[in-house]
Design a protein with these regions (language model features):
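Short, acidic loop-to-helix structural element flanking the phosphoryl-transfer center
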Residues: 72-104, 144
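Asp-based, Mg2+/Mn2+-dependent phosphohydrolase catalytic module
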Residues: 1, 5, 110-111, 115-201
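Hydrophobic alpha-helical core bundles mediating ligand binding, dimerization, or RNAP-core interactions
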Residues: 19-23, 58-61, 78, 113-117
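Short beta-strand segments
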Residues: 8, 13, 104-108, 165
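Generic hydrophobic alpha-helical segments
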Residues: 34, 43-47, 93
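Active-site neighborhood of HAD-like aspartate-dependent phosphohydrolases
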Residues: 1-39, 67, 176-177, 192
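A metal-dependent, Asp-based hydrolase signature
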Residues: 45-75
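Alpha-helical elements of Rossmann-like donor-binding domains used by nucleotide-donor carbohydrate transfer enzymes
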Residues: 18, 22, 42, 56, ...
Length: 201
């Protein structure tokens, strides 16, 4: 079987409010103001596809939020999204590979984050057979082509794949292609799934 796992809030806990809190502190802008003005719009998606530079992304977001931050300050906030690894999921990934299954990560991410998490959380790459990252592929979830690409590269049919993601839209997109989609709603979703199918951790 091919097991495809999203990264944020599946393998590692993330919280975007932490990003805005850092930017609020550094810019002197109230958190409530930033929360209202920030949106994951077109530039956000372009950044995840690797279609714009980190500097262009930072400048655009700062303009949209009407805040003045240096690139270093922007980056400090951007990296604050990460909380910690979910060790129970890392353990499952390792056990799946030991049992002969293929385990890959499929994440909507960006160059700024990729400059950070691989060094701070090396167990993610160490526990996966391959990392499929949106900015390397010029595609992002929930676009069907990104799922088709992973299946083709891995040599599995949709009915041989299980996909875990915390965003329902992504799960539905994978399911529409015939992949078994699991919506991760909390830390227990992944361990509970494998208990239900009889896979021992």
């Amino acid at each position: 079987m091919l097991y495809i796992l999203d990264m944020g809030n599946v393998i590692i806990d993330i919280d975007f409010k932490r990003v805005l809190a850092v930017w609020s502190n550094l810019s002197g802008t109230p958190l409530a103001t930033l929360t209202k003005s920030f949106s994951m719009g077109e530039m956000f998606e372009k950044h995840e596809r690797g279609q714009i530079t980190d500097l262009e992304f930072a400048d655009t977001l700062c303009q949209e939020m009407s805040i003045s931050l240096s690139f270093e300050q922007f980056t400090a906030g951007w990296h604050a999204i990460f909380i910690d690894i979910r060790p129970e999921v890392i353990q499952i990934m390792e056990k799946l590979r030991e049992a002969g299954h293929r385990v890959v990560v499929l994440s909507n991410t960006n160059r700024l984050h990729q400059d950070y998490w691989p060094h701070n959380y090396p167990e993610i790459a160490a526990s996966a057979d391959y990392l499929y990252l949106s900015q390397d592929l010029a595609m992002r979830k929930p676009e069907p082509d990104i799922f088709k690409y992973v299946l083709e590269k891995e040599g599995f049919s949709p009915d041989q794949a299980v996909f875990f993601d915390d965003v329902l839209e992504n799960v539905e997109a994978a399911s529409a292609l015939g992949i078994k989609g699991i919506h991760v709603v909390d830390r227990q979703t992944v361990p509970d799934y494998f208990k239900e199918v009889g896979f021992s951790e």
